Amino acid sequence: MMKACGFDIGLDHPFFLIAGPCVIESRELAFETAGRLKEITGKLGVPFIYKSSFDKANRSSGKSFRGPGMDEGLKILADVRAQLDVPVLTDVHDIDQVAPVAAVVDMLQTPAFLCRQTDFIRACAATLKPVNIKKGQFLAPHDMLQVARKARDAALEAGGDGNNILVCERGASFGYNNLVSDMRSLAIMRETDCPVVFDATHSVQLPGGQGASSGGQREFVPVLARAAVAVGVAGLFMETHPNPACAMSDGPNAVPLDRMAELLESLVALDRVTKRSGFLENQFV
């Protein structure tokens, strides 16, 4: 069990939610989405962390919108945090960003493509902030054990207790321009002794599927989210937007903001059943 962002995280507790637009498009959008998500999750009793990126460093095309940049993006996230009283998360992309980002946010996130970059992972963990490490699309779930150990060792060396690491499943490459979610990975990744998060929106992404940008199949977000909650997860990650068709990044796999309440309500009910009845796989070892 981990305590972060003011709440308990683990399989003995209700799932928490990381949600927000893929990228910070404007100050107004950040406040609109964070405010609405706070309202929805508050009514449902879902612990909530607001997420949005100041820079999308791995866009398919060099001409695609990347975000407002670190300085402006962190100002917006800091204001959301202070004025709406919600914890915030954003991703970091290189070691130089780690310290300034950690000074602002409540939780760091590392991109899937960078999960094997040892110095980078160690730098994030050494801040002693909670770090959500996304599993690369190219890794087997059991490979995350070594990634988690690197991070935990760095946290211990920095004077922490090593209990600040989360691991996140976001699908595995399945041929070209496609991902598949193996729900066994959620159980396997528990062997890291880290809370496991499921990214329900990037798992339906079609990477590079539109040539200069990625496609997605948002209609399958509820399917995979329900499956993950039925297996048992500590947290869910879902990107959302008021108008996904106009989103500047990852619109095809974003959940429409006006559908989030309905989706979360069904997931909360399923989570209660799953965690009340225990985890079936433990009976077959």
Curated annotation (Swiss-Prot):
Keywords: Cytoplasm, Lipopolysaccharide biosynthesis, Transferase. It is an enzyme of class 2 (transferase). This is 2-dehydro-3-deoxyphosphooctonate aldolase. The lineage of its organism: Bacteria, Pseudomonadati, Pseudomonadota, Betaproteobacteria, Burkholderiales. Its EC number is 2.5.1.55. The keyword Transferase applies. GO terms for biological process: keto-3-deoxy-D-manno-octulosonic acid biosynthetic process. It comes from the Bacteria. One of its GO terms (cellular component) is cytoplasm. NCBIfam families: KDO8P_synth (TIGR01362), PRK05198.1 (NF003543). It catalyses: D-arabinose 5-phosphate + phosphoenolpyruvate + H2O = 3-deoxy-alpha-D-manno-2-octulosonate-8-phosphate + phosphate. It comes from Bordetella pertussis (strain Tohama I / ATCC BAA-589 / NCTC 13251).
